[in-house]
């Protein structure tokens, strides 16, 4: 079984609680999503490879460690994934960005792909798939399956919120993909929404219904 990393930092939990509020405005919800995703990036990339380089300070030459942001790809699952993309790019502005367009069939709850665009040479890159919610897991499973066809070095999945059903679905299909989240909520309802959840993340991010 794959691993689930719940990021319990007080700032992350505080902001998630503010996002849960029914009366949070679109502006507030969007800002909080951006802030949480930026904070989570520190933990998600804790084990990212580094390389040593020479540096000249104002006083002398020394060495330091840096990451190669160009080898990192944030893959946003459209459309809601774009709502947490900017926060992560704030921390790693040199990262490349890919997009997977998936929508949930309202009858089967299955994922249907309508768009796929990735940077070249994905075989040389580490991929972080992002989506605010890991609910039924169908979109996540489909996205990871599609990405594996491109042969990236590694894949991680990042979401603000998930539930036992979503975790089980992704790890059953892809036990090698770790999940990073701010919380694991109680369950799904009959419509495939997380309870207690934050509502429809895409609608709340973009002010649509």
From Swiss-Prot:
Cofactor note: Binds 1 Mg(2+) ion per subunit. The magnesium is bound as Mg-PRPP.
Sites where the protein binds 5-phospho-alpha-D-ribose 1-diphosphate: 79, 104, 131-139, 200
Regulation: Allosterically activated by GTP.
UniProt-recorded name of the protein: Uracil phosphoribosyltransferase
NCBIfam families, alphabetized: PRK00129.1, upp
Pathway note: Pyrimidine metabolism; UMP biosynthesis via salvage pathway; UMP from uracil: step 1/1
Positions of uracil binding: 194, 199-201
Lineage per the UniProt record: Bacteria, Bacillati, Actinomycetota, Actinomycetes, Mycobacteriales
Entries under InterPro entries matching the protein: PRibTrfase_dom, PRTase-like, Upp_B, UPRTase/APRTase, Ura_phspho_trans
GO biological-process terms attached to the record: UMP salvage; uracil salvage
Tagged with keyword Nucleotide-binding: yes
Gene: upp
């Amino acid at each position: 079984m794959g691993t689930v990393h719940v990021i319990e930092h007080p700032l992350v939990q505080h902001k998630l609680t503010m996002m849960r509020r029914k009366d949070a405005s679109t502006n507030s919800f969007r800002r909080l999503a951006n802030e949480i995703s930026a904070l989570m990036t520190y933990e998600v990339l804790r084990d990212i490879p580094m390389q040593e380089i020479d540096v000249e300070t104002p006083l002398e030459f020394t060495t330091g460690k840096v990451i190669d942001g160009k080898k990192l790809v944030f893959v946003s699952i459209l459309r809601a994934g774009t709502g947490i993309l900017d926060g992560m790019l704030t921390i790693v502005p040199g990262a490349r960005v890919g997009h997977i367009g998936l929508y949930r069939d309202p009858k089967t709850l299955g994922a249907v792909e309508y768009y796929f665009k990735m940077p070249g040479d994905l075989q040389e890159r580490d991929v972080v798939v992002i989506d605010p919610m890991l609910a039924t897991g169908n979109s996540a499973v489909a996205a990871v399956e599609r990405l594996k066809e491109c042969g990236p070095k590694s894949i991680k999945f990042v979401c603000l919120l998930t539930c036992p059903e979503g975790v089980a679905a992704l790890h059953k299909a892809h036990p090698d993909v770790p999940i990073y989240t701010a919380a694991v909520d109680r369950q799904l309802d009959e419509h495939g929404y997380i309870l207690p959840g934050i509502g429809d993340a895409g609608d709340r991010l973009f002010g649509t219904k």
